[in-house]
């Protein structure tokens, strides 16, 4: 039996200097667009390591710490896990804590999706990207992007 997911995750908003935001479409829910997300693999996995791992697994982008730098917003959201996904968690778990990160990338960066996880990707101005997200916490993070960039 597959182990239960840990109800702690990361959200990584990928953007360009001019606030174009990358969204990816879920393979298990076509039409559901989001930023990179993913749960900790182990309870002691550091959050920045989770963010870097998920960024690479879902987009092929490597956060090298020099050209591509993950920014920890030191913010988190607690939200209800959608009922359709609760079977992935231990019985009785209904909430997840999501930690927010962002990463600025060049506009021409190559994107390599994980086909089992995502179908398509699109770059959109941040306000349009926020409107397209199915998750309200993801949309809110994108709306806060202008206040959480190095510019």
Task: Pin down the residues of each PLM region.
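Conserved N-terminal beta-strand and adjoining loop/helix that marks the start
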Residues: 1-21, 43
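Active-site beta-strand termini and strand-to-loop segments that position acidic
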Residues: 14-17, 26, 103-105
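A conserved beta-turn-beta hairpin within the catalytic core of GNAT-like acetyltransferases
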Residues: 29-32
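A short gly/proline-enriched turn/hairpin at secondary-structure junctions
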Residues: 34-37
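Unchanged
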Residues: 40-137
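A small-molecule sensor/coupling module
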Residues: 141-148
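Catalytic cores of nucleic-acid ligases and guanylyltransferases
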Residues: 151
